[in-house]
Every structure is written in structure tokens, then in C-alpha cells.
Amino acid sequence: QFLGSMLMIYFSADFIVRYGKEIAISLGISKYIIGLTLIAFGTSFPEFVVSINASIMNEPSIVFGNVIGSNIANIALVLSACALITHINSDKVGKQDLIFFLLSSVVAFLVSMDGNISQLEGVILLSGFFFYCYRIKKNIIIEKNNIESVKEKRFDFYIIIIIVCSFFILVTGSNVFISSALSLAERFNVSSLVISTTMIAIGTSLPELATSLIAVINKEYELLTGNIIGSNIMNILMIMG
């Protein structure tokens, strides 16, 4: 069940990213913005669903561990694995996005120091996420204004159906994922926090890892850096909030 649910999460997220990218390209958005938004959201969706389900199951330690572990995995596992393959050109990285990520990490650390996140603190984190979305929207408008002509490309309706079905499979897979992870924790007498910061965090980071490796192989460094930065920001502000 554990392995099967991981495969469901991986392949469904892969479809979301693949076809989401095709839609975004047809709108004339840069690769970095694509990585920062659609691809980051698609690869962060497993963490989102896992954390929401963990909250419903009253397992806050899984939420904390999942967000922290996933962000560590994105940097220590995903980014380092890509760097081992080739030199990563980060010239296109938005410095403001990087600063925003660091600031959001500090805020998340401060609000979670007591081991709990209140509703007010959740509102603060979500407010930061909405401000982040507003900034991205402004950047998209600026980019489109700077492009003299954008060739419009129609995308078929079946792509929307594939994405919706992929989201459904993702939700189902994450449900099985949490249940099997908790069963493993009970069987080996391991705390749910340890399980969430290791197996669940790495498992939900598989879409980021796969997408980033493919981006590096194709020398799409903007997609790689945008994906990692955007995914980490969403993990902190959207998922934890």
C-alpha cells in the first residue's frame, strides 16, 4: 500500500505538471514563472493534500514534519542531486522571490516555536501567501507587456480532464499514503513526527525531484529554480497556514 500510494502520487503529479506546463506556455508565460507557479503548485499538491488529511485526522505532527521535511528534501536532496549532474545556472532566479522565501521561513519558525499554530497565525501565513500570489500576478502582467507578440496556442479540452483526474488520483493516493505511514510508525514504535520528516517528506518530494531532474537534463534551469523556490514558499505559507 505504501509503495502503491507513492506511485499514485508521483504519476498523478507528473501529469499535472506536464499538462499544466503546456497550458502555461500557450499563455506566453516565462519558464521561470511557470516553475514558480503551476509546476510549483503541482509538485506541492501532494504535501498540501497530505497535510490537510493529517489535520482532519488530528495529526499536527505530520503537518509540521511534512512541511519542514519536504523543504529540507527540496534543497538537500533535489537541488543537490541536480547539482551533481551538472552546473546549475541560477542567473534567472528572482532575487525578490529568494528573499521572500527566506522571510517566510523566519516567520514560520517564529509562529511555530511554541509547537502550535493558532488560527490567527494561520491567517498571517495565508495573508503572506495571497500577497505572494499578487506579486506573481503583477510580474506576469509586466512580462506580457514586455513581449511584443505572443503566439496564441489553443489547448484541447482533454488536457483539463486529465489534470482533474490526476488531482483525484493524487487525493486518493495521499489518503492511502498517510494511513500506511501511520501503520508503519505503530508497527515499529516510531513517532509520527519521525515518520513525517523522513518517509512522508521524501515521498511527497518525489514530484519535485523527478521534475527537477528532467529540467536539468533538458537544461531548463529556470524551471528547476522556480519550482524549488515556489514549492518551498507554498509549503510554508499555503500548506502550514
Model-derived features: where do they sit?
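Hydrophobic alpha-helical segments, chiefly the membrane-spanning helices
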Residues: 1-241
